[in-house]
Swiss-Prot record:
Residues 54-268 form the DCUN1 domain. This is Defective in cullin neddylation protein 1. It comes from Cryptococcus neoformans var. neoformans serotype D (strain JEC21 / ATCC MYA-565). The gene is DCN1. Pfam families: Cullin_binding, UBA_4. Keywords: Ubl conjugation pathway. The keyword RNA-binding does not apply. GO terms for biological process: protein neddylation.
Length: 274
């Protein structure tokens, strides 16, 4: 059941105080009803209420449907493709799969353990306990990804971990082609959305780093032709949200990766030549 207007306001207050996710905040508000009691429970380390047992059972059955026959502790690539087909997700063009990966605790591309899979779906509002209900919730995740800066960064950074091979991988960077594919998946949809996950700081005004600047970034990276480090990947979002249209407000003494320093100089040279 959707939250009432009053409860939605309480969730916003709870998140502002505790820094938790919307789903986690909603669980505390639904259980404790009042902001003071919910915050006290959070800081006293009382767990958020678990999903309804019937919901957990049904979600477990969904996971079982897609688990790998040769490795019954995981859903793997084949099962993920079947899941995507049932949810009408094109994994090559729809970033919502990365939303699910981040929310459902996927540690490697196309792999899902049962417990975080069940807990992740149960954390969504609306008592989702079937594939049709999960499919109906995907537009909400797509909208959240392009409009919520906190959520965008969470999903975007999780995508880096998946693409480099998961937390156990010794690979510390992404091949450039992979990074470009992912940047193209994440950034352009957020540019024209209002509110935007890439809104300009500090006033959350419309983005000033938009498609033309993004195209220059891709052009620059293709000329450099180097793998993309974790720092460059993560800080590109902060850079995009802070830079002005004319690239005049860049803090050259800030702790930016050298790749971003070089990009700023590249753009300034382009602008001087116009």
């Amino acid at each position: 059941m959707p939250l009432s207007t009053k409860d939605s306001l309480l969730v916003t207050q709870f998140r502002a105080i505790t820094g938790t996710s919307s789903a986690e905040a909603a669980k505390y508000i639904k259980r404790y009803k009042h902001i003071e009691a919910a915050v006290d429970a959070f800081y006293n380390n009382e767990p958020a209420p678990r999903a309804d047992p019937a919901q957990e059972r049904k979600l477990g059955e969904i996971w079982e449907k897609f688990k790998d026959p040769s490795d019954p502790k995981l859903i793997k690539i084949d099962g993920t493709m079947e899941l995507c087909e049932e949810l009408d997700i094109d994994p090559g063009t729809d970033a919502v799969l990365f939303c699910l990966a981040a929310d459902l605790g996927s540690k490697a591309t196309g792999e899902w353990e049962k417990a975080p899979f069940v807990a992740g779906i149960a954390s969504y509002p609306g008592n989702i306990d079937s594939l049709p209900k999960l499919k109906a919730y995907l537009p909400t995740l797509r909208k959240k990804l392009v409009s919520d800066p906190e959520y965008f960064k969470k999903v975007y950074n999780h995508a880096f971990q998946l693409a480099r091979g998961g937390p156990q991988s010794l690979t510390r960077s992404l091949p450039l082609d992979t990074a470009i594919d992912l940047w193209t998946l994440f950034f352009p949809p957020a540019f024209n959305h209002s509110p935007s996950a890439l809104s300009h700081l500090p006033d959350n005004s419309p983005p000033q780093f938009t498609q033309p600047e993004f195209d220059l970034w891709i052009e620059f990276m293709q000329q450099k032709n180097k793998a993309v480090s974790k720092d460059t990947w993560a800080l590109l979002v902060d850079f995009a949200r802070g830079i002005d249209k004319d690239f005049k407000e860049y803090d050259e003494d800030g702790a930016w990766p050298s790749m971003i320093d070089d990009f700023v100089e590249y753009v300034r040279e382009q602008k001087r030549g116009q």
